[in-house]
């Protein structure tokens, strides 16, 4: 009789939740069920109540997310007087020994019901209740990941700040007035040692092929060396002059004489000195003819073993000297 009632109960209510079945097994001790003559009636009432509760749980889970703590709270609120309440409730095979004989005929149906409930829960999106230990592990991993992320961000900001501070320090060193003054003095001394004028430096800057930098005037180089340029112009001109100075010193050490680094023009010719015998011969020719022709100048230069241009310049200078002497004698 009792077995038939149980079978009718399971067939009428296929959506019974496994936790309700386990709760009923734990909360009702086996001796009371075996010794009670109304056990079939009691079990039928309990089955109907459990079926309503299971239907309510399933219908509620379709519209709301499944909350494990609510189910655990409901189960813990039921007063359990059996000493075997420590047995896991959710496991269908963990039945008490006293219940084995009573529920032996329900094992096949119970497995089918569990499969049906599991499939219905998976369709509704709830699935099996998550394990609290798994949830705790996932939450812990999430917090660790967020912690590493925040730590990386916190480490990134000081790094950015340190790079910014490093660039600021470099700019401060370059814009230091004392550093600019020391470089200007050093540049002046080394330029003089190389034998290059300020005008030569200004014109040679165009040969460096630096983008945006052309030749500069002699006054600009002079004002740089005397620190009379504006502070911003001093900062802008310093790397250009430093690049020129490095190349000029390298060329000076190698002694290969790069003319474009200095002026690009010919060096000043040395003053020609004429020996006394050649000088007396030129004076004699000048007394005869102060304005010789080009052919006569070439013949004199060949005779005295001098350059034609030297002879021509000497005659020109001698005429200018005679004019000055006549002018001073009249006045």
UniProtKB/Swiss-Prot annotation:
<dbReference type="InterPro" id="IPR000327">
    <property type="entry name" value="POU_dom"/>
</dbReference>
<keyword id="KW-0539">Nucleus</keyword>
<dbReference type="GO" id="GO:0043565">
    <property type="term" value="F:sequence-specific DNA binding"/>
</dbReference>
<keyword id="KW-0963">Cytoplasm</keyword>
<dbReference type="InterPro" id="IPR013847">
    <property type="entry name" value="POU"/>
</dbReference>
<comment type="function">
    <text>Acts as a transcriptional activator. Acts by binding to sequences related to the consensus octamer motif 5'-ATGCAAAT-3' in the regulatory regions of its target genes. May play a role in specifying terminally differentiated neuronal phenotypes.</text>
</comment>
<dbReference type="InterPro" id="IPR001356">
    <property type="entry name" value="HD"/>
</dbReference>
<dbReference type="Pfam" id="PF00046">
    <property type="entry name" value="Homeodomain"/>
</dbReference>
<dbReference type="GO" id="GO:0030154">
    <property type="term" value="P:cell differentiation"/>
</dbReference>
<dbReference type="GO" id="GO:0007420">
    <property type="term" value="P:brain development"/>
</dbReference>
<keyword id="KW-0804">Transcription</keyword>
<dbReference type="GO" id="GO:0005737">
    <property type="term" value="C:cytoplasm"/>
</dbReference>
<comment type="similarity">
    <text>Belongs to the POU transcription factor family. Class-4 subfamily.</text>
</comment>
<keyword id="KW-0238">DNA-binding</keyword>
<keyword id="KW-0805">Transcription regulation</keyword>
<protein>
    <recommendedName>
        <fullName>POU domain, class 4, transcription factor 3</fullName>
    </recommendedName>
</protein>
<dbReference type="GO" id="GO:0000981">
    <property type="term" value="F:DNA-binding transcription factor activity, RNA polymerase II-specific"/>
</dbReference>
<comment type="subunit">
    <text>Interaction with ISL1.</text>
</comment>
<dbReference type="GO" id="GO:0005634">
    <property type="term" value="C:nucleus"/>
</dbReference>
<feature type="region of interest" description="Disordered">
    <location>
        <begin position="81"/>
        <end position="108"/>
    </location>
</feature>
<dbReference type="Pfam" id="PF00157">
    <property type="entry name" value="Pou"/>
</dbReference>
<dbReference type="InterPro" id="IPR050255">
    <property type="entry name" value="POU_domain_TF"/>
</dbReference>
<dbReference type="InterPro" id="IPR009057">
    <property type="entry name" value="Homeodomain-like_sf"/>
</dbReference>
<keyword id="KW-0221">Differentiation</keyword>
<dbReference type="GO" id="GO:0006357">
    <property type="term" value="P:regulation of transcription by RNA polymerase II"/>
</dbReference>
<dbReference type="InterPro" id="IPR010982">
    <property type="entry name" value="Lambda_DNA-bd_dom_sf"/>
</dbReference>
<dbReference type="InterPro" id="IPR017970">
    <property type="entry name" value="Homeobox_CS"/>
</dbReference>
<feature type="DNA-binding region" description="Homeobox">
    <location>
        <begin position="267"/>
        <end position="326"/>
    </location>
</feature>
<feature type="compositionally biased region" description="Low complexity">
    <location>
        <begin position="81"/>
        <end position="97"/>
    </location>
</feature>
<dbReference type="GO" id="GO:0000978">
    <property type="term" value="F:RNA polymerase II cis-regulatory region sequence-specific DNA binding"/>
</dbReference>
<keyword id="KW-0371">Homeobox</keyword>
<keyword id="KW-0010">Activator</keyword>
<feature type="domain" description="POU-specific">
    <location>
        <begin position="172"/>
        <end position="249"/>
    </location>
</feature>
